[in-house]
């Protein structure tokens, strides 16, 4: 007999504890840790949902009073056990309920309609199908003849035709196709189709030569990873010092070793050009998560990560919980940005959670900034983080000249604009 410890999907402090339910025999194969289930709850046995956080063959209470799970919700991304452990850490570290924490680490838990791709594949040889076509033409079975004609004219006969194209362009119907399938003339293949908002991007890699400081940073980080040393690095580099290329070289090293990477970028900085740069290097092994994606696109990207179809996830704070099991590195660009602090319960900071998740999986964390946060910089002085400096701009470019302006003098000169007189003059000169 199998029993499940379940956290109820209700964010109330009085219910913030596991409830034990019995798992009926037909549901035991699907009742895994992290699964979402329907259960009877309370005196009225109203149906609510909850998350399985533990399984046991021992009953904690009177078995006669233990209720049965109604159903396992099969559709949805199942939370991995280490993510549930991370949720518990978030709850104890930042407050809130366990349900709040689970929802934070499962940003795409809601059910989404799965998108399928169908193809109609001819079974007989092309010559045999032509004979079948002639026989059907003699019987005036025009619908079947029309479908066979389309299959015979397909560019790749063995690969058949797309189901939707066949239905729309050649007026095929499901009933006719099923009848032809029953005859053994065709088969309808159904496969999972993922919504990929960046499917038009292609890899176009070009070799980048690192300067001495960049190469030293990559060698240090990758060397420590190869030695099995899990560390947190603060890459303190001036603007234009080539921090992104250091990220990419380290990620490439991680991917070659069979592991995966998460790249956190503030939403405001997550531009098409940024995404294109990663696609140019890593191709379709990259996926992106951001708020502008539809619910279906978000769900599909997390499922692609869970099935191992991708190795790199790029996105803002929520991408931190990508269900990677072989996580090798978490990169956090512009780590000083305030958007990494959650404004909703639990009010976690992505930097601290990234470090905790990396500890759980033996991964490294690479923080990058030209103006590091006080917290990150302090950790480098205590030895908790390793600071790496990039003081030169990549490609030999010179640093911009900085001029300090005293705004009190601007006010004294009756200049109440947000622009100083010096800046205004230089803008006008540039426009001329």
PLM segments and residue spans:
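Flexible loop/turn segments at secondary-structure boundaries
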Residues: 242, 374-376
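Short intrinsically disordered coil segments
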Residues: 21, 67-70, 404-405, 418-423
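Internal, well-ordered alpha-helical segments in soluble enzyme and binding-protein domains
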Residues: 217, 350, 376, 419-423
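Accessory, non-ATPase domains that flank or precede helicase/AAA+ motor cores in DNA-metabolism machines
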Residues: 1-369, 381-397, 431
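Conserved interdomain hinge at the start of the Helicase C-terminal
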Residues: 251-252, 407-432
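Interdomain hinge/linker at the junction between the two RecA-like core domains of SF2 helicases
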Residues: 376-418
């Amino acid at each position: 007999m199998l029993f499940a410890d379940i956290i109820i999907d209700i964010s109330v402090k009085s219910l913030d504890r596991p409830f034990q339910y019995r798992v009926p025999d037909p549901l035991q194969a699907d009742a895994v840790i992290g699964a979402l289930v329907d259960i009877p709850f309370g005196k009225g046995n109203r149906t609510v949902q909850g998350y399985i956080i533990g399984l046991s063959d021992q009953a904690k209470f009177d078995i006669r009073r233990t209720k049965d799970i109604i159903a396992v919700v099969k559709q949805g991304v199942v939370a991995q056990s280490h993510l549930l452990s991370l949720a518990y850490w978030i709850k104890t570290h930042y407050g809130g309920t366990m349900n709040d924490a689970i929802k934070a680490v499962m940003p795409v838990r809601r059910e989404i309609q799965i998108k399928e791709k169908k193809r109609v594949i001819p079974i007989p040889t092309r010559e045999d199908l032509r004979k079948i076509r002639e026989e059907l033409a003699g019987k005036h079975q025009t619908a079947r003849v029309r479908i066979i004609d389309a299959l015979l004219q397909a560019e790749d006969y063995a690969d058949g035709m797309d189901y939707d194209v066949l239905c729309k362009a050649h007026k095929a119907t499901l009933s006719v196709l099923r009848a032809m399938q029953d005859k053994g003339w065709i088969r309808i293949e159904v496969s999972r189709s993922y919504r990929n908002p960046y499917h038009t991007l292609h890899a176009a890699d070009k070799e980048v030569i690192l300067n001495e400081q960049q190469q030293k940073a990559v060698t240090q980080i990758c060397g420590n990873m190869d030695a099995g040393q899990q560390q947190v690095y603060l890459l303190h580099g001036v603007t234009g010092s080539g921090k992104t290329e250091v990220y990419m070289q380290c990620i490439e090293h991680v991917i070659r070793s069979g592991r995966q990477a998460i790249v956190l970028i503030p939403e405001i900085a997550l531009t098409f050009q940024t995404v294109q740069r990663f696609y140019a290097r890593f191709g379709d092994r990259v996926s992106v998560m951001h708020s502008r994606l539809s619910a279906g696109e978000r769900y599909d990207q997390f499922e692609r990560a869970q099935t191992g179809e991708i190795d790199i996830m790029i996105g803002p704070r929520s991408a931190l919980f990508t269900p990677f099991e072989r996580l090798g590195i978490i990169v956090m660009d512009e780590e000083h940005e305030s958007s990494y602090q959650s404004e909703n319960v639990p009010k976690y900071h992505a930097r601290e959670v990234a470090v905790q998740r990396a500890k759980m999986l033996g991964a490294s964390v690479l923080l990058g900034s030209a103006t590091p946060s006080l917290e990150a910089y302090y950790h480098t002085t205590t030895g908790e983080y390793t600071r790496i400096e990039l003081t030169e701009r990549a490609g030999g470019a010179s640093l911009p000249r900085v001029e300090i302006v005293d705004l009190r003098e601007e006010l004294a000169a009756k200049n109440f604009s947000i622009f100083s007189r010096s800046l205004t003059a230089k803008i006008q000169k540039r426009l001329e």
